[in-house]
Amino acid sequence: MNQSIKVLITGTSQGIGKAIAEYFLEMGHKVIGIDRQEPSIFHSMYSHHQCDISDYKSLPEIDDVEILINNAGTQNENDIDINLKALIKVTEKYGIQKHIRSILNIGSAS
């Protein structure tokens, strides 16, 4: 079995982010989710932080992230604040860590 890695994903309460989180959990990895909504994933290897990623000061302290997946997004009057500015702030906070392996930025619209 592969060694467990620590994956941080934004926007894990529904849609693409939830599916990605569930995939990494099935593979035996530790997943940390950040979302404005309450958790929708209940798994022993999952922890959830409920906050608004556009508020940099509210981002939790999380160390030793190995994979960062910026998935949170919106289509409303705040889309630049979430889809661009928050992505940059999240990457600055978690993407420049000693153990980081990969950063994936996801953008979608329907």
Question: Where on the chain are the PLM-derived regions?
Answer:
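Conserved N-terminal Rossmann-fold NAD(P)-binding element of oxidoreductases
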Residues: 7-11, 34
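N-terminal Rossmann NAD(P)H-binding glycine-rich loop of SDR-like oxidoreductase domains
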Residues: 13-22
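Conserved glycine-rich Rossmann-like NAD(P)H-binding loop of the short-chain dehydrogenase/reductase
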Residues: 27-41
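Rossmann-fold cofactor-recognition segment
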Residues: 43-56
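Conserved catalytic-site loops of classical short-chain dehydrogenases/reductases
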Residues: 66-67, 101-106
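Conserved NAD(P)H cofactor-binding loop of Rossmann-fold oxidoreductase domains
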Residues: 71-76, 107
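A short, exposed helix-loop element centered on a Lys and neighboring polar residues
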Residues: 91-92
